[in-house]
Design a protein with these regions (language model features):
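Anionic N-terminal interaction surfaces
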Residues: 38-105
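Short cysteine-rich clusters marking metal-coordination/redox-active sites
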Residues: 10-13, 31-34, 272-275, 287-290
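Short Cys/His-rich micro-motifs in 6-15 aa windows
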Residues: 30-44, 290-296
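Acidic, Ser/Thr- and proline-rich intrinsically disordered linker/docking segments
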Residues: 115-266
């Protein structure tokens, strides 16, 4: 136990590391305070050397200047938000209310290499309690489905290549109860209320519930509520939110790349309509001799 309680020194800042504050590196130790300054999207700390961590912390310190200059022109998402600075061609992803202090990574639109919406589906078997209180399965088996919505942004960055975050705070499942009081018990939502007409409960802050007129879950010979959940307003809200984020990032990435291609295209000599000189227009599309607008 001697080495366990042996005092360790942070290879980054030189400070003493407390008993539960050590964060292992490939060739040294790092205190929790230094580790907390790393990018939240970085996951290879244990495989990183002391020098690599120092380089990243320098990058993170420089990032604070980008955060200070960031001006939000568009906000996408709820808890975890994608903030766009469309004037400067940059974005960040953060859940912090005071993001200026949180120092989220500021990335350029051109850093985006891909973006997709991932919808994870899970299912839980619906069971009932028999006369002895034991769990029993229905025949055929019945299942309640739930869904979680994730955005995955692929990026060019020296310290991480993926930003993945969840859109919904809790799983979208129409609040189905998965353990019934008996084989003939009425389907209920969690909390005890009977489910009638398939209209799901409205969560706090949600604009509505399931599709009006949907069939009650497990009615007749049905063994799944997947269709009802996927047609609920909550499901559609997060699906639309994910598509909006995905489309926005792919659109600005395409715009930046088209501009880069246009800027790199060979310049064509034109005759200036004002001075008659043969000129190659400058970046503003003006004659290099008289300054007249040659392009448009």
């Amino acid at each position: 136990f001697g080495k366990l309680f042996e005092k360790k020194e942070c290879a980054i800042c030189g400070g003493e590391i407390g008993l539960l504050g050590n964060r292992k590196l490939e060739d040294g130790n790092c205190c929790k305070n230094c580790a907390a300054k790393l990018s939240p999207w970085f996951s290879d700390r244990r495989q990183s050397t002391v020098e690599e961590i120092k380089e990243q912390l320098a990058y993170r310190e420089a990032n604070q200047e980008k955060v200070a200059a960031f001006r939000v022109t568009r906000t996408l998402g709820e808890g975890m938000k994608v903030l766009l600075d469309e004037d400067d061609g940059r974005f960040m992803v953060t859940s912090a209310r005071n993001w200026q202090e949180a120092n989220p990574d500021v990335l350029s639109f051109s850093d985006v290499t891909g973006c997709k919406l991932d919808i994870d589906e899970s299912k839980t078997e619906i069971q009932y309690k028999d006369a002895e209180g034991k769990r029993q399965s229905f025949s055929p088996r019945r299942y309640a489905f739930s869904y979680d919505f994730y955005i995955v942004i692929n990026v060019n960055n020296p310290y991480f290549n993926e930003i993945r975050f969840k859109l919904n705070g809790s799983s979208v499942d129409n609040d189905e109860e998965t353990l019934l009081d008996g084989p003939n018990a009425q389907p209920c939502v969690r909390g005890g209320g009977l489910r009638t007409g398939g209209a799901g409960p409205i969560r706090p802050g949600m604009p509505g519930g399931s599709r009006p007129g949907a069939r009650p879950f497990m009615g007749g010979s049905r063994t799944s509520n997947a269709d009802e959940v996927r047609s609920s307003m909550e499901y559609r809200q997060y699906e639309e939110m994910g598509r909006e984020i995905r489309d926005a990032l792919l659109q600005v990435r395409e715009q930046v790349r088209n501009e880069a291609v246009a800027a790199a295209a060979p310049k064509t000599a034109l005759t200036c309509p004002f001075c008659g000189a043969t000129t190659t227009p400058d970046a503003s599309g003006c004659c290099e001799f008289c300054g007249g607008a040659v392009n448009g």
